[in-house]
Amino acid sequence: MFKRRLKFKGPDKRWVHEEAHIADYNEATEIGRVRLGKLFFFYRDLGVKYYVPYDYIERTFCRVSECHPDDSPAYYYYRLILVHGEKEFANLIFNEKEDVEKILELLKEGHPYIQFGYVEPEKKKKKKFFS
């Protein structure tokens, strides 16, 4: 029977299917749609498996979103945001706050060079059209 080979898309948008990536993916700790390997951070988004080297991640934080359906109580979902070069490159949605907290805790333990928490972006000055 046809066996599907694992392949991953990297931050440079290129596909890889190297044995080092596959072995790290198979041995990684799985939390929701995220896997934390020894070499790479793996996540799924729209059916595509992505890998990110840990040194590519400069900052990470949790963003809480609130939804108010009609005639129902509000519910919350949690977004794990990964940042590189002041740009958010991954926005991973979780239903459970504990999953995001566990991922952040494991990242803090294993990768102390990653910064944690939200930073307000610089406000750009508006151009004056008339003097």
PLM ranges: what are they?
Residues 1-38:
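Anionic N-terminal interaction surfaces
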Residues 2-3, 59-131:
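Acidic, Ser/Thr- and proline-rich intrinsically disordered linker/docking segments
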Residues 20, 25, 36, 41-44, ...:
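Generic preference for well-ordered secondary structure
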Residues 32, 48, 86-88:
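Short acidic/polar mixed-charge low-complexity motifs
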Residues 33-34, 51, 81:
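His/acidic/aromatic-lined binding-pocket segments of jelly-roll/cupin-type domains
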Residues 37-73:
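Phosphoinositide-binding peripheral membrane targeting modules
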